[in-house]
Amino acid sequence: KKWESNPREWLNTIDIRDVMNQYEVKHPDFEFIGPVPMDFDSKVGFGKCVINELCNIKLESLLEKGKRKLGVIFNLDKHTQSGSHWVAMWAQFPGTETSSDGEICYWDSYGMRPNPEVVVLMNRLESQAKTLGHPVAININKRRHQYKNTECGVYCIYFLTSFLEGRA
């Protein structure tokens, strides 16, 4: 892997997926979706979305499978582009051992607000949670942590794993 010889090399989709899949195994109540492009919700034909798993997400189905924690890592580029910057979303729904309250959290290591596509997803999950009687709070990181252009993937992984490991 390039990053083994070049520590400034960006993590790619496969690197991030490989790490996060290990956490899905370690935490059976955790569902990871991604990494996904920012246009995940866009229709590409025949009623399909760029990322159907996320476009058609149903909180009730996740909860029925015992998945009360959800992590998503997004790239700000569209699926037809090469990739620019990683951001993440964490969602935790009532009934987990770490919290009686639910929350949806957005993370951008530059402290920028979420893109409209992510806001739509967060609102969709919030609405579904409320309908199921599990209201959630939405929290958005506004503090900048990253000042170079090589760490965003690592920050996203750390953000999600901090919740999973009880550090957040």
Where are these regions (language model features)?
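Cysteine protease-like catalytic core of ubiquitin/ubiquitin-like
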Residues: 63-167
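General structural signal for secondary-structure boundaries
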Residues: 12-16, 116, 168
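Cysteine protease catalytic domains with a Cys-His-Asp triad
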Residues: 1-87, 93-104
